[in-house]
Swiss-Prot record:
Main function: NDH-1 shuttles electrons from NADH, via FMN and iron-sulfur (Fe-S) centers, to quinones in the respiratory chain. The immediate electron acceptor for the enzyme in this species is believed to be ubiquinone. Couples the redox reaction to proton translocation (for every two electrons transferred, four hydrogen ions are translocated across the cytoplasmic membrane), and thus conserves the redox energy in a proton gradient. This subunit may bind ubiquinone.
PANTHER family to which the protein is assigned, alphabetical: NADH DEHYDROGENASE SUBUNIT 1, NADH-UBIQUINONE OXIDOREDUCTASE CHAIN 1
Full protein name: NADH-quinone oxidoreductase subunit H
A molecular function GO annotation: oxidoreductase activity, acting on NAD(P)H, quinone or similar compound as acceptor
InterPro entries per record: NADH_UbQ_OxRdtase_su1/FPO, NADH_UbQ_OxRdtase_su1_CS
Subunit structure: NDH-1 is composed of 13 different subunits. Subunits NuoA, H, J, K, L, M, N constitute the membrane sector of the complex.
Membrane topology (UniProt): Multi-pass membrane protein
Keyword DNA-binding: no
Chain ranges passing through the membrane: 11-31, 81-101, 114-134, 154-174, 186-206, 237-257, 264-284, 304-324
GO biological process terms held by the UniProt record: aerobic respiration
Lineage: Bacteria, Pseudomonadati, Pseudomonadota, Gammaproteobacteria, Enterobacterales
Organism this protein belongs to: Pectobacterium carotovorum subsp. carotovorum (strain PC1)
Subcellular localization, as worded in the UniProt entry: Cell inner membrane
């Protein structure tokens, strides 16, 4: 076909890869919700969901049908435009953040020279979704949850950024593929161990996952900024949270554990196995740890995480200058 030029073919292939990768991420986020319930049941000596389909295999389908047919109710006292916009921002910001993650040497959505900065920007955008939801709901518990979430997320994003600067300094680039290539012989988790620990803790906090789920603590503030949401709007918040877990897990693999590098197995298999391991760790943390007070969470961040990241960055700079 005369209109199908090599340039157009390359564009179509790139767009096709992007669509496939993002659909897989959404699917992983959805399946993780079911896998989490099964694993929590295993950890706690329960059966978990096992009634729908063989061994509970169709539970996710049943949940999707239930959510589709639930009334998507918008209370009269809300700011309807902002109330509707908030879950869309929460979902898309975490999904777009995954775009900079290289899965294999040839598969990825966007190869940006400012990859890490792009992730930090998308993570910051997710704060607006929480603020919009809390303010537009016109509910005291929702607003309190939004204030908690914004303060917690902004604080721990500082520690995420500082923990990644050591990796950037070692690789000499913000590009994610360059960072993966720099780990061909030695994973960053060894020279940047304290940076990894801080990134892992801050990643859990930014995802609002247990034990850092104070913004939506059911026992304290009745699910926080989610309180007035139902139907598919709540579903976007729900799936967006799990997409955030997938994204943070993939970033840990890419930045600290060599990305797709590994012996014998194909690159995609190594990337999937490493990412799946960290997704399981999110679930194990939820099953194992209690929820601290909100002031303890903020105090831990500024009094423990910040000094560790600064010392790690200073040590990295000293080593680089010494080797130079």
């Amino acid at each position: 076909m005369s209109w199908l030029t090599p340039e157009l073919t390359e564009i179509l292939i790139t767009v096709g890869k992007a669509i496939v990768i993002l659909l897989v991420v959404v699917t992983c986020g959805a399946f993780m919700s079911m896998g989490e319930r099964r694993l929590l049941g295993l950890f706690q000596g329960r059966y978990g969901p096992n009634r729908v389909g063989w061994g509970g295999s169709l539970q996710l389908v049943a949940d999707m049908i239930k959510m589709f047919f639930k009334e998507d109710w918008v209370p009269n006292f809300t700011d309807k435009v902002i109330f509707t916009l908030a879950p869309m921002i929460a979902f898309t910001s975490m999904l777009i953040a995954f775009a900079i993650v290289p899965i294999t040497p040839t598969w990825g959505v966007a190869d940006l020279n400012i990859g890490i900065l792009f992730f930090l920007m998308m993570a910051g955008l997710a704060v607006y979704a929480v603020l919009f939801a809390g303010w537009a709901s016109n509910n005291k518990y929702s607003l309190l949850g939004a204030v908690r979430a914004s303060a917690q997320t902004v604080s721990y994003e500082v520690f995420i950024g500082l923990s990644l600067m050591g990796v950037v300094a070692q690789a000499g680039s913000f590009n994610m593929r360059d960072i993966v290539d720099s780990q061909e012989h030695l994973w960053n988790v060894i020279p940047q161990f304290f940076g990894f620990i801080t990134f892992a803790i801050a990643g859990v906090a930014v995802c609002h996952r247990h034990p850092f789920d104070q913004p939506e603590a059911e026992q304290e503030i009745a699910d926080g900024y989610h309180i007035e949401y139902s139907g598919m709007k709540f579903g976007l918040f729900f799936v967006g949270e799990y997409i955030g877990i997938v994204t943070v897990s993939a970033l840990m693999v890419t930045l600290f554990f060599g990305g797709w590098h590994g012996p014998i197995l194909p690159p995609f298999v190594w990337f999937a196995l490493k990412t799946g391991f960290f997704m399981m760790m999110f679930i194990l943390i939820r099953a194992s740890l209690p929820r601290p007070r909100y002031d303890q969470v903020m105090s831990f961040g500024w009094k423990v995480c910040l000094p560790i990241t600064l010392l790690n960055l200073l040590a990295t700079a000293a080593v680089i200058l010494y080797n130079a």
